[in-house]
Amino acid sequence: EVAEDSGFRTIAAKGTELARPELGHSVHVEVAGLKPNRPYYYRFTAGGERSLRGRARTLPLPGTRTDALKFGVCGCQHYESGFYGAYRHLAREELAFVYHYGDFIYE
């Protein structure tokens, strides 16, 4: 589900996907028809369990002037070295995007 508000009262998009082996047993979702340059909230449900709420922002319209933007950068992490504390800091920021240059997890 993708919503316009953090309480998911106004759903902008929703759908169903399968985690496929050819995509690394993960779900790849492309959402169309969202309004430009605004925040949206998303969540996933699988097997009766619901994810925590995530936040994303759509791009401005092409040609729109942007004076500055803030982005996060992260790389490889290791569960035993701190339970992914850097992501907590990234989530608190109003970022335009996050560039992740390495593996998501080592187990």
Language-model features, listed with the residues they occupy:
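Divalent metal-dependent phosphoesterase catalytic cores across multiple superfamilies
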Residues: 1-107
